[in-house]
Amino acid sequence: MFRVKIISQKRTKSVQMLENDQLDILGQQPSLYKLYTQICSIYRVPDPSAHDHIVNTLTRGLETLAKNFQWLAGNVVNEGADEGNTGTYRIVPSDKIPLIVQDLREDLSAPTMDSLEKADFPIYMLDEKTFAPCMTINPPGNTIGMAAKSGPVFAVQANFISGGLVLTIVGQHNIMDITGQESIINLLNKSCHQKPFSDEELLIGNIDKSKSIPLFDETWEPDTTLVHEIVETSRNTSGEEKEQSCSSNSTWAYVEFSAISLQNLRILAMQTCTSGTKFVSTDDIVTAFIWKSVSRARLSRLKPETKSNLGRAVDVRKRLGLPETYPGLLVNMTFNTGSLKSLDHKSLGVLASQIRRKLDPKVFDLAYNTCALATLLSRCPDKTKVSIPQPIDTLSGIMVSSWAKVSLYDVDFNLGLGKPKSVRRPRFISLESLIYFMPRSSRGEMVVALCLRDKDWECLNADKEWTNYATHIG
C-alpha cells in the first residue's frame, strides 16, 4: 500500500493572508473553472421584522470571515493560456465576500414557505436562476449570475420568501469540494455568532493549498491506475448512441428514503453480503440499490449486455493525512462496472459489497492514485487531457456524489430562526445520470437528487421494488 509522508507545518504568530494564491493541483482542471457547488438552507421566518437582523448578522459574519481568510473574498482568474496550454488558475484578492439579498415575497412566481414545506421541498420549486448567486455551470457567453462577469471563490444569497428564508451558499469547485465548503460554512456560522477563530482554524483555513498533495519525483511514469483519468482524444460513438443522446429528455427530481426504508434496505443487504465483507455503509447500500434499480429501468431501452459504469466521488483527506476540515479540493473517484442484466440480477448485498471493496486500499489505493493524478496534472501543459473523471457514458452509467455526512441541519448562523427545515441543492441544468445524496437530518431520512431520462423515471415509478423503499418528491 502507498503511504504519504506528511510534513507538519509550524504555527506562526500571525497568519499572512494571500501569501500563496494558488489552488490545489486538482483545481487546475479547466472543467472546474466557474463550476459552482450550491447548497440551500431553508428556514421559517415567522416575523418579517427579523429581516434586517438577518441581513446585518450575515453581513458582519462575512466581513469577519473575509478579514481572517482573505482568499475567500477573492476571484479565480486564468493566466498564461494559449494554444496547447491551459494556463494557471489563481486567486486574485477582492474587498469582500459577495452577499446578495433578494425579497421575493411579492413575486408570484416564487414559492412560499408553506408551499415548499407542503410539497416537501421539491427541486422543481428551487431553481438556481432564482435562488443562487452563481449558476452551477457558466460556459463562455453566460449572462446569468455573478459568474457571468467574475469568478468569486465564495458567495451567499439570502432569498426572503413569504414566511421563510432560502439561504444559498456557493463555492467554486476548483477551490473547494463539498467537504471544504462545509468547513467554510461552519467558520461563517462561528463568525455570525461573533466567536473568535482558534489558532488551529486559522492555520488550516489559510494553509498553502498548492502543497496539499505530495507529487512524485521525475522518475515516476504514469501507469494503469489512471485509466479513468486520461481523456481519450477521440471516441467512437454508434449511431444509436448519438441518436439517443441527442434526443434525451432528462429531469431532476428528489426521492426520499425514510429512516424505516433505510433500516429495511440494510436488513436486506446484510442477508447477501459477500463473505469477508466486514462493513457496508448506508451510502454503499443506497448507492447499490439506486444503481441496480436504474439499470433495471434502462433495460426497457438498452440491450441487456450494455455496460454500466458507476463513478463515485470519495473524500481523500484522511488517506492523505490532512485534517477533515481542510477547506480545499481533495476528492477522487472510484469506479465499478457491470452489464445492465447482471446488475439487475445481482443481490443488493453482493453489489453493496462490491462497491465497498473499492474503498479497500489493498484493492484500490486512493492515496497513490490521487498523488499520481496530481503529478500527471502538474506535468501536463494542456490539462484538458486529464480529468476526474473521464466522462461516464450517461446512456447507461451513473455518477454519485454523497453529501450525506455534511452536517448543515445544526447550523443556525445566529439568525434567530432556529435550525433549517430543509437543506437542498437547487435545480440546475439537466445532466443525465448525475446523482447527489443530500445532507441527512436528525430524523434519519436520506433525500437523493437524481437526473434521469423521463423514460427511466416512468419505469422507476412503476417499479414496485423501487417504490417500496423510495418516495418520489419531485
From Swiss-Prot:
InterPro entries: CAT-like_dom_sf, Sec_Metabolite_Acyltrans, Tri101-like_N. It comes from the Eukaryota. The keyword Transferase applies. One of its GO terms (molecular function) is acyltransferase activity, transferring groups other than amino-acyl groups. Pfam families: TRI-like_N (PF22664). It is an enzyme of class 2 (transferase). GO terms for biological process: mycotoxin catabolic process. One of its GO terms (cellular component) is cytoplasm. Keywords: Acyltransferase, Transferase. Its EC number is 2.3.1.-. Gene3D superfamilies: Chloramphenicol acetyltransferase-like domain. Trichothecene 3-O-acetyltransferase involved in self-protection against trichothecenes, mycotoxins acting as eukaryotic protein synthesis inhibitors. Its existence is surprising in a non-trichothecene producer organism which needs no self-protection again endogenic trichothecenes. The persistence of this non-essential gene may be due to a selective advantage that it may confer, like a resistance to exogenic trichothecenes. Belongs to the trichothecene 3-O-acetyltransferase family. This is Trichothecene 3-O-acetyltransferase. It comes from Saccharomyces cerevisiae (strain ATCC 204508 / S288c). The gene is AYT1.
